[in-house]
């Protein structure tokens, strides 16, 4: 079973949280065309899956066809205009969890560069380019515990 995600803006930490929908989830799904969401499979992603990838700062579960368990992006206020309003990022991740398309590592990197960084470029705020991602699941960050840029070289 593929992971199902909900989004929650945490204004106290200025982060956008994407979390699996489960009985213990405190997040609320964003309104959208997704319908009812079901809990993820706890064993959907091998613990070492994606550990070799050069796309740094993302939990290794981000590269699974099951989708990420949880991602938290800093600079959520910048994302609010570019991403949250259209639900673009949650929609793409939801399609990914359903297996409607499969991204290679290059595809994932291109997706984040094009859809996240390119849209933030239009907002004209340089601080958003240092975007940090925290894992909220059992899959460890490639570069934990120090914050890192998405595209730090391996």
From Swiss-Prot:
Coiled coil: none annotated. Keywords: Activation of host NF-kappa-B by virus, Activator, Apoptosis, Host cytoplasm, Host G2/M cell cycle arrest by virus, Host mitochondrion, Host nucleus, Host-virus interaction, Modulation of host cell cycle by virus, Transcription, Transcription regulation. InterPro entries: Transactivation_prot_X. The keyword Translocase does not apply. Pfam families: X. May form homodimer. May interact with host CEBPA, CFLAR, CREB1, DDB1, E4F1, HBXIP, HSPD1/HSP60, NFKBIA, POLR2E and SMAD4. Interacts with host SMC5-SMC6 complex and induces its degradation. Interacts with host TRPC4AP; leading to prevent ubiquitination of TRPC4AP. Interacts with host PLSCR1; this interaction promotes ubiquitination and degradation of HBx and impairs HBx-mediated cell proliferation. This is Protein X. The lineage of its organism: Viruses, Riboviria, Pararnavirae, Artverviricota, Revtraviricetes. The gene is X.
């Amino acid at each position: 079973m593929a992971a199902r995600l909900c989004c929650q803006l945490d204004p106290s930490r200025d982060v956008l949280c994407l979390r699996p929908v489960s009985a213990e989830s405190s997040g609320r799904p964003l309104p959208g065309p997704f319908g009812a969401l079901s809990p993820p499979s706890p064993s959907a992603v091998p613990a070492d899956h994606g550990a070799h990838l050069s796309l740094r700062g993302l939990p290794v579960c981000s590269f699974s066809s099951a989708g990420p368990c949880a991602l938290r992006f800093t600079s959520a206020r910048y994302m609010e205009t570019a991403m949250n309003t259209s639900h673009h990022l949650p929609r793409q991740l939801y399609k990914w969890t359903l297996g409607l398309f499969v991204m290679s590592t290059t595809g994932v990197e291109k997706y984040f560069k094009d859809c996240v960084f390119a849209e933030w470029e239009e907002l004209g705020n340089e601080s958003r380019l240092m975007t940090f991602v925290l894992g909220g699941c059992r899959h460890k960050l490639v570069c934990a515990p120090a914050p890192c840029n998405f595209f730090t070289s391996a």
